[in-house]
Amino acid sequence: LSPHELFNVAEDVRYLAPEQLSGFEDAFKSWQDAARSNKSVLARQRLHLIFQLLRHTGARLGEILSLDDRTAFDRDRSMVRIKGRNAVREVPIPEEFCEAATNVLDSPMGCGLRGEFFKVDPGYLRRTCYERGRECGLPKELANPRVLRNTRAVEMLRNGVPLAVVKEVLGQSSLDLAAGFQQFTSQD
């Protein structure tokens, strides 16, 4: 047996189960698709894209909101460059998401915000997360950027990604923080 098959997440770590994450993603997508005016379409596209970046990268909210959309994405390698506290790290993202994100950024609506696309009020993004979470039955404490970060970490660990790689992807300076996600029982 591999360690990733045995570990349990510490009780104090809030994260989403796969079906909760799927519901959260669906709620954001439905909300985006329900936009009618050009202004609303753009606002919702921006917030949905930020949500997806949080979901797929495990980055901190501040890291995503400070991205320079002109240089952050590497379409050829399906990567996003995230400036962390001490360095820039390259985080892989799903190819189809990278393509969709760069298409939005290159669209007429996205071009008008070049260099500023991700600069939104963090409180507004959090409130939008709470609202989408409520729509899919998530309690407020599970519908936020921190929980998306934790969820991504748990997802990677459960898929057998080594702890050191998870630490690097999340931009953690020590293994202690990421190690808190893994707990093994004495029988393990």
Residues covered by each model-derived region:
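Flexible interdomain linker/hinge and immediately adjacent N-terminus
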Residues: L1-S30, I82
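Basic, Lys/Arg- and aromatic-enriched nucleic-acid-binding interface segment
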Residues: P18-R60
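Short, leucine-enriched amphipathic alpha-helices that occur as contiguous helical runs
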Residues: L21, A43-H48, P122, R126, ...
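Active-site/catalytic core of tyrosine-dependent DNA strand-transfer enzymes
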Residues: L21, P94-K140
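Short, basic (Lys/Arg/His-rich) helix/loop patches that form interaction surfaces
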Residues: D33-S40, Y130-E168
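A short, glycine-centered helix-capping/turn motif at helix boundaries
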Residues: L53-E63, N159-V161, Q172
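Conserved tyrosine-mediated DNA breakage-rejoining catalytic core shared by Y-recombinases
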Residues: T57, G62, S66-E99, S186
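Catalytic-site neighborhood detector that most strongly recognizes the C-terminal catalytic loop/helix
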Residues: G84-R85, L170-D188
